[in-house]
Amino acid sequence: MALYLSEKDVRKLLTVEMALEAVESAHRDLAEGLAVDVPRARSRLPQTVLHILQGALPAQGVIGYKAYTSNRSGNRFLVHVFDSATGVLRGVLEADFLGMMRTGAASAVASRYLAPKGSVVAGVFGAGWQAEGHIRTLCAALPMQSIKVCARDADKLTNFCARLETEMGVRVRPSNPEETVRESDIVGTVTTSATPLFQEGWLKPGVHLNGAGSNALIRQEISEAVIRRCAPIVVDSIPTALAEAGDLLPLLEKGRLHARQLVELGDIIIGRHPGRVDDQAMSLFESQGLAIQDLALAKRVLDAAELAGLGQNWPLQMES
């Protein structure tokens, strides 16, 4: 019998460490040819957009998809997980928190492999739901000592930083754009900005950048000048990046960047690509989000739910 897990169930079961391990395993499987990932498809109406990501991790025993709607009233996320050997439905998970944690985990895993040695200071643009996931996962992946956060809403930013500092025991403080970037070992962008968030001259040598908000051509968080200085330029999936990476698409269209220059995160994880080779060079990870990240994490949450006896039996029984 399949399980249905609510947001409340998922929050009880999902840990930061689980998210980091799941996302890294998904990228490893993809690099080793043990995964199938289909780029996001969208059906658009004036009021509502339906987004679907699908994929499979047969070595982990799962195949499935995430479907979510975006509307002025909010977003709604569901992940459907099937047994890859039998095709039987294993579970349906409400996936707002799950998606937040897997998105943050992708940038955190990339930082673990690409950030300069001894990284302890990070700057983050954004003080919303996804920014929180980035900060929590980054602090679990690396021994961060200080997080500087920049956002437009001053009151929201102050409350956001105070809450995370109290909950995490790491210094989290409000900052302006320049202070957020200067002297940061890692800089993350988690916004919907249509224009670059910081100037090239503010970045210190060797900084690692995580771009996670620019998943459409109309969005651009990181300037072309900054991107052209980065090596390597790492993506979660080249096909997905070529379709959605708003930071990269203008450079690709102008011929100032070529697809062959892009490196998939999984290739660095398995050692096929060396990753950072120059301590003074800037590195960049562009995160768009993959179905296999959701599936790997959902599988682990389902396993934990079965052990803990959480969740509801899915009410529909399919005829054989």
Spell out what each predicted region is.
Residues 122-123, 283:
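Conserved beta-strand elements of the Class I
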Residues 127-128:
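Glycine-rich Rossmann-fold phosphate-binding loop(s) that bind the pyrophosphate
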Residues 141-165:
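NAD(P)-binding Rossmann-fold cofactor-contacting core
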Residues 219-320:
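Adenosine-phosphate binding glycine-rich loop
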